[in-house]
Amino acid sequence: MVTIYAWLEIRATYLDEDLHPEIDEKKVFDDIDNLIKKLKYNELKVIEKNYSRFVQFSVMENHKTERTEEMISMYENITKIATGSYGLLYYLDDEDEVYSDEFRVLVSKKGKCEWKRDENFSPCSILIEEFD
């Protein structure tokens, strides 16, 4: 089973926009909107509140699929386009040869994404499940 839980606050840049007038916030958000519109499996929720944009989604599949790959790729692409974005994507694939018993977290900040091991739920077989 593949499970993804993700959230991402979308911000055009992490730089002070007053000091960087070359950053076109409208273009950044238009690019994000176009990216989202092109998704084949658009199952994310976009929340606009208080002049902020927030994306959240979850995916639950029996196996790794095109949908899981597309959603991870979209998360990474938003981070590259809107470099001020930050968030977490929790990922578990119980068929993964290396990480079958642990959640991995894709941490997004300052235009980059980095995979990390989750310490709160991993190893799953000990921290959230018990088998005799």
Where are these regions (language model features)?
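Short, extreme N-terminal segment that most often corresponds to the first beta-strand
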Residues: M1-D31
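Short, surface-exposed beta-strand/loop "edge" segments at domain boundaries and coil↔beta transitions
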Residues: Y14-E17, H63-T68, E95-D101
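Short, intrinsically disordered low-complexity segments
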Residues: D30-E76, K80, S85
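A short amphipathic beta-strand at an alpha->beta junction
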Residues: G84-E97
